[in-house]
């Protein structure tokens, strides 16, 4: 099992029960198509199981993490993250930060000037499977092995 997971909120706020929206707020997934990188701990995986009908997640690899940091990472004021910002945080490059996130050594919410989430666009060419069903039932929700390619289309 990987040390970190990439979680993407697929469904919006309409008809979302209070317990699910509260759980997703705790995971920093307040809006549709937001993505977060979380360490694969039992309590966080339990939260993902609880809201699996609203989010999709996949084990994170370093290349995807670096691509997200380079293209979609933002700091306060919604400004792009520069290499100087990464040096202030103690990382020489985005590859080093991506490796630390993938290994579960740090979280984006602990790196203060950075936003704890990535704002993604809807996927180019749409979803190939249903957004209303779990992955095992020909959908995309829950633990999804193909989510990495979908996220690359959303960047």
Curated annotation (Swiss-Prot):
UniProt record, GO biological process: maturation of LSU-rRNA from tricistronic rRNA transcript (SSU-rRNA, 5.8S rRNA, LSU-rRNA); translation
Alphabetical keyword list: Ribonucleoprotein, Ribosomal protein
One Pfam family cited in the UniProt record for this chain: Ribosomal_L30
Molecular function GO terms recorded: RNA binding; structural constituent of ribosome
Domain of life where this protein originates: Archaea
InterPro entries: Ribo_uL30_ferredoxin-like_sf, Ribosomal_uL30, Ribosomal_uL30_arc, Ribosomal_uL30_euk_arc, Ribosomal_uL30_ferredoxin-like
GO annotation, cellular component aspect: cytosolic large ribosomal subunit
Similarity comment: Belongs to the universal ribosomal protein uL30 family.
Protein name: Large ribosomal subunit protein uL30
Gene giving rise to this polypeptide: rpl30
